[in-house]
């Protein structure tokens, strides 16, 4: 799947203008891809049960990293502070928090389930199960919101809720959580002028075509320009400074333009295949920890891809969510590959058992 990016990344004019090197995006991503594939292979050959012991520590580590970002480093790239930078190397802790949340929830819910025949333990037990399960998740989400990064926060809440639902969380608690989350989301949008502008431009992209609605408008132009078969590899015009973030959050628009409707459907089909294999691995896992871990990794990828597709196609307001495995970005690519390595190990053990 990652190979799709070689035909869509703006590796020519855009990279030359920004960095003075025509292939810097491709070279950087290729290096990170090799590192990620190595990590994926190591985790694929490592028994996933070894992750059960220190899993409770991972959220704490990510919280510390996120606090370091907010309090000390404050790298104001695009008016945000989402990275810890060590010279030319940048780490995005919010991406690491995704795996940490999945590991913690799988570990915690597995511990609570010991001795029970069915995953019914968290239907009513709010104080002893739901609250301690979700508290570290909410801490991570709160810190990510402070960066600010609403898109990643929503993504984490979605796959965390999915894990809890499969573990037995009743619709009553989901409805209660939604009733609390929706007013909070409204406040987060209305209190931030740029978010409000994005929401208004989502309802009417033509209301501010040179301002808040510019990115969505250019994205839709790219998608519509592709037609059935696309304009051809490396022939995208929208990525040449017309479409902001063409190599990251809006790379799917470039794929639609270059490969057309057929290429766009193929990319979606690849994620469907990934999801199908991941869900099969989850249901065939030897134990509850593996089942929840596989489900968490799979839904992490699928929710993120769905949000990205929806943003690019103008179905939801614009958010900064990369397309898994394809968008340019080292932290996201590494997390997705490492998660896939764990998923492959679970699938392998399920097959052997």
Which residues are covered by each model-predicted region?
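TM-adjacent membrane-interface loops and short helices in multi-pass inner/ER membrane proteins
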Residues: 201, 205-248, 252, 259-263
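Hydrophobic alpha-helical transmembrane segments of multi-pass inner membrane proteins, especially
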Residues: 16-215, 253-311, 338-342
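Glycine/serine-rich anion-binding loops at beta->alpha junctions
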Residues: 87-97, 146-148, 227-232, 321-335
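Transmembrane helix boundary and interhelical junction motifs in multipass membrane proteins
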Residues: 149-154, 231-236, 246-248, 261, ...
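Membrane-interface transmembrane-helix boundary segments in multi-pass integral membrane proteins
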Residues: 8-10, 24-29, 329-330
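A juxtamembrane structural motif centered on a specific transmembrane helix
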Residues: 306-353
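Short, small-residue-biased leader/transition segments that mark boundaries at the very start
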Residues: 1-9
């Amino acid at each position: 799947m990652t190979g799709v990016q070689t035909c869509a990344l703006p590796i020519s004019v855009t990279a030359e203008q920004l960095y003075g090197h025509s292939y810097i995006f491709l070279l950087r991503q290729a290096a990170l891809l090799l590192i990620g594939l190595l990590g994926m292979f190591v985790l694929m050959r490592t028994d996933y049960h070894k992750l059960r012991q220190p899993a409770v520590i991972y959220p704490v580590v990510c919280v510390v990293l996120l606090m370091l970002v907010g309090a000390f480093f404050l790298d104001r790239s695009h008016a945000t502070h989402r990275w810890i930078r060590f010279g030319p190397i940048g780490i995005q802790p919010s991406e690491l928090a995704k795996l940490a949340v999945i590991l913690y929830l799988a570990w915690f819910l597995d511990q609570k389930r010991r001795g029970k025949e069915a995953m019914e333990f968290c239907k009513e037990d709010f104080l002893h199960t739901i609250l301690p399960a979700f508290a570290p998740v909410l801490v991570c989400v709160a810190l990510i919101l402070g960066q600010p990064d609403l898109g990643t926060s929503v993504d984490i809440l979605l796959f965390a809720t999915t894990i809890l639902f499969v573990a037995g969380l009743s619709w009553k608690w989901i409805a209660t959580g939604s009733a609390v989350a929706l007013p909070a989301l409204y406040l987060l949008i209305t209190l931030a002028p740029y978010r409000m502008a994005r929401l208004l431009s989502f309802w009417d992209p033509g209301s501010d075509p040179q301002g808040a609605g510019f990115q969505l408008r250019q994205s839709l132009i790219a998608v519509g320009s592709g037609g059935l078969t696309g304009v051809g590899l490396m022939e995208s015009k929208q990525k040449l400074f017309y479409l902001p973030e063409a190599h990251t959050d809006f790379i799917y628009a470039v794929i639609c333009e270059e490969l057309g409707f057929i290429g766009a459907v193929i990319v979606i089909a690849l994620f469907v295949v990934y999801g199908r294999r991941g869900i099969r691995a989850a249901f065939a896992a030897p134990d509850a920890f593996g089942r929840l871990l596989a489900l968490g990794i799979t839904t992490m990828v699928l929710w993120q891809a769905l949000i990205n597709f929806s943003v690019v196609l103008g179905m939801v307001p614009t958010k900064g969510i990369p397309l898994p495995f394809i968008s340019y970005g080292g932290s996201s690519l590494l997390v997705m590959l490492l998660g896939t390595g764990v998923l492959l190990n679970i699938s392998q053990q399920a097959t052997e058992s």
